[in-house]
Amino acid sequence: MPRAAKSSRKKDPNTPKRNMSAFMFFSIENREKMKTDNPDATFGQLGSLLGKRWKELTSTEREPYEEKARQDKERYERERKEYDTKLANGEKTGKASAPAAAAAAKEE
């Protein structure tokens, strides 16, 4: 039975970027070294190797990444709250374009 087409809702480009997990911070920091150590590994294989290495880390070794994840979560929650407040107030969520800002400044 064919699926019904999902309605394509336009995503607001000004929506705050989601927070990253501790593992994502670890992956970003270690992917290049892992790629150098395993030059023939595919993207998926690198992901598996990174996951395996992540599981081997002690809680002490994970702490810097966990802290970055906590800070990023706080950033996301703060930005999301500001974004939602602007939406609720009917304000535009984007920044004014340079020509519009220049025109507004010129009128003053």
Curated annotation (Swiss-Prot):
It is found in: Nucleus; Chromosome. It comes from the Eukaryota. DNA-binding protein that induces severe bending of DNA. Required for DNA-binding by the FACT complex, a general chromatin factor that acts to reorganize nucleosomes. The FACT complex is involved in multiple processes that require DNA as a template such as mRNA elongation, DNA replication and DNA repair. Also augments the fidelity of transcription by RNA polymerase III independently of any role in the FACT complex. It comes from Schizosaccharomyces pombe (strain 972 / ATCC 24843). Weakly associates with the stable spt16-pob3 heterodimer to form the FACT complex. Residues 16-84 bind DNA. GO terms for molecular function: DNA binding. InterPro entries: HMG_box_dom, HMG_box_dom_sf, HMGB. This is Non-histone chromosomal protein 6. Gene3D superfamilies: High mobility group box domain. CDD domains: HMG-box_NHP6-like (cd01390). Keywords: Chromosome, DNA damage, DNA repair, DNA-binding, Nucleus, Transcription, Transcription regulation. Its main location: nucleus. One of its GO terms (cellular component) is nucleus. GO terms for biological process: chromatin remodeling; DNA repair. Belongs to the NHP6 family. Coiled coil: none annotated.
